[in-house]
């Protein structure tokens, strides 16, 4: 997890609010602006970028799925609010039950709740049950929701012990009969289109969940390029008299890696701009082909960035495998 002082500084500087609408105290960031912010952070530290990515993303998605008056109460009365949630189900089947006062009780343990240590609220997924049977919606399907629970209604279970992204704090979150207050039961994390003009609020949810993850990957690749450049200029390989930077193979691979990074970044930005252009023209959703291109660009960018880090780590030789090497950290984070 991130140290408390780092999270506090990030909150103070508005990193968890920049994607919110201006009327809710944010900067109303576009998808391209979001990518740039997260990429910059990711070049420094991927776990910091990932925490900001999840916190700012869920803050912004939640505001689109709640009544604007309730949103003012949550976001403007507490400028330091940070949200988390949306992970997978744990080993115990989750459930939620309506209460007589209109609230909902929730039981369950969700996995991969990145940034939970920083959060004021958590969205916990569970089906709405009545006895042993699921409640059905108007479409005849079981009702499954992400229930919005305040911090005192859930606990963190320390399960995050991994190779890469170690600082993301993606532990489990558990609740045993936690209360989702009646005024929060109408909040829908996945509403589109939402109440706000920013095209981001009319993007299909799978795309909205994709481009900012790719931004973190871009940051890792960018940081790897910077780290390798420093290594190449200062490392003199065994049995050599000049630095690694003088070797043609190092120059070739550095050029190859930079071309991979810059080309996948450019395509991602191009496709996200095309999505926003369509939405600015008044469409409720982007066209199928535009969405397909953007989703493909997101996946392509993430995969190419992993290859960039692999290539540079390999070219750095034994220097890259040392635990003190920034390339070693980039390798684990990229994967």
Annotate each predicted stretch with a short phrase:
Residues 4-12, 17-119, 134-135, 141:
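Glycine-rich flavin
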Residues 263-300, 313-316, 321:
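C-terminal helix-coil-helix/basic helical segment that borders enzyme active sites and/or dimer interfaces
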Residues 10, 221, 264:
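Residue-level signal for inorganic ion chemistry
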Residues 87-90, 107, 126, 149-162:
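Active-site glycine-rich loop that binds ribose-phosphate moieties when present
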Residues 163-261:
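Glycine-rich beta->alpha junctions and the first turn(s) of the following alpha-helix
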Residues 316-335:
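Glycine-rich phosphate/cofactor-binding loops in nucleotide/flavin-utilizing enzymes
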Residues 109-153, 317:
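DPxDG-like acidic metal-binding loop motif
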Residues 219, 255-262, 295, 299-306, ...:
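Generic structural signal for well-ordered, non-transmembrane alpha-helical segments
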């Amino acid at each position: 997890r991130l140290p408390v002082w780092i999270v506090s500084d990030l909150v103070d500087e508005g990193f968890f609010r920049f994607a919110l609408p201006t009327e809710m105290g944010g900067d109303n960031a576009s998808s391209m602006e979001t990518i740039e912010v997260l990429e910059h952070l990711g070049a420094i530290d991927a776990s910091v970028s990932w925490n900001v990515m999840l916190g700012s993303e869920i803050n912004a998605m939640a505001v689109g799925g709640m009544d604007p008056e309730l949103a003012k109460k949550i976001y403007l009365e507490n400028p330091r609010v940070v949200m988390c949630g949306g992970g997978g189900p744990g080993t115990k089947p989750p459930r939620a039950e309506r209460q007589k006062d209109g609230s909902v009780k929730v039981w369950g343990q969700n996995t991969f709740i990145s940034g939970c240590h920083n959060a004021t609220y958590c969205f916990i997924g569970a089906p709405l049950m009545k006895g042993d049977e699921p409640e059905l919606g108007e479409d005849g399907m079981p009702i499954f929701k992400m229930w919005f629970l305040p911090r005192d209604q859930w606990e963190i279970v320390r399960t995050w012990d991994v190779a890469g992204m170690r600082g993301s704090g993606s532990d489990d979150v558990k609740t045993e009969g936690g209360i989702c207050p009646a005024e929060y039961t109408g909040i829908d994390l996945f509403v589109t289109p939402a109440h706000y003009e920013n095209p981001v609020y009319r993007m299909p949810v799978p795309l909205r969940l994709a481009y900012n993850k790719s931004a973190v990957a871009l940051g890792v690749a960018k940081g790897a390029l910077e780290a390798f450049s420093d290594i190449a200029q200062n490392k003199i390989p065994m049995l050599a008299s000049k630095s690694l930077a003088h070797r043609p193979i190092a120059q070739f691979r550095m050029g190859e890696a930079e071309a991979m990074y810059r080309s996948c970044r450019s395509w991602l930005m191009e496709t996200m701009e095309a999505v926003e252009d369509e939405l600015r023209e008044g469409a409720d959703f982007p066209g199928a082909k535009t969405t397909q291109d953007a989703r493909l660009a997101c996946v392509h960018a993430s995969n190419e960035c992993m290859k960039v880090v692999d290539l540079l780590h390999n070219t750095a030789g034994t220097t890259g495998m040392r635990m003190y090497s920034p390339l070693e950290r980039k390798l684990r984070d990229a994967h």
